[in-house]
Amino acid sequence: MRNLMLGVFAVFMAIPAQDRPQPTCNRCSASYIPNDELQAYLKRVPAETGVSDQQVRAVDSGKTNVAIGIVYRGKLSGGSPNVAEHDFISEVYHVIDGSATIVTGPDIVDWKRRPATNENVRLLNGPGGDGVSIRNGVTHHLKAGDVLIIPAGVGHQFTQIDDHIRYLMVRVDPDKVVPLKDEEASKADLRKAPGLR
C-alpha cells in the first residue's frame, strides 16, 4: 500500500512539471550594457573611412546567440560600393539619429563570397557575400526611431546618407557562427586604439 501511495504521489508531482515548458537557456543570466559603454564605441569612428561597425556584446541565449553592435556611417552620396549579405545572421537596425536610404532584397547582382579570413566574417556577420547591386530591391528611408529587420540571406546596400546615421544593431545568430563577447572583452576592446582588435 505504501508503494502504491508513493507511486500516486509521484504521478501527481510530475503533472505540474509537464505543464511548464523548459526554457531554451536554462539558468542563463541577463546581459546589461550601459549607455556610457555604447557612447564610448560611437566615439571610436575611424576618420579615414567614416564607418564604424563594432560588436559590443555577443551572448549565448540558448538556442541562438544574440549580439549587440553599434554602427556609425558618415555621409554617402552615389551609393555604397557593395551590397552585403549574411548567410546565417539576421540583423535588426534601430536608428538612433541621422537618416539614410537603404535598398534590400534577395536578388544580388554579381554576388561573390567573402573570404573566411575577412574580419567582418570572423567577428561580426559570419559567412556571406558582396554584390554590386540588388535587382528589384525595396527602398527604405530610415530616420531616428525607425527599425529595419534584415533576415539572413537578404542583401542590403546604403545608397544615400545625407550627413550621418547611427544605429544600434541586434544580430541574431541561430547557428552560433560568430564568437561570443562578454563585458570584459568589450572593455578590453575599448582600451585599444580604434580599428585594432
Q: What residues fall within each predicted segment?
A:
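Bacterial N-terminal signal peptides
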Residues: 3-16
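A short, N-terminal "cap"/entry segment at the start of jelly-roll beta-barrel domains
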Residues: 15-88, 180-197
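Primarily extracytoplasmic ectodomains and periplasmic/lumenal surface modules that are beta-strand-rich
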Residues: 66, 75, 100-101, 109-110
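Short, conserved beta-strand element in jelly-roll/cupin
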Residues: 87-106, 116-130
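Short, solvent-exposed loop/turn positions at domain surfaces
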Residues: 89, 136-138, 144
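Conserved metal-binding segment of the jelly-roll/cupin
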Residues: 140-162
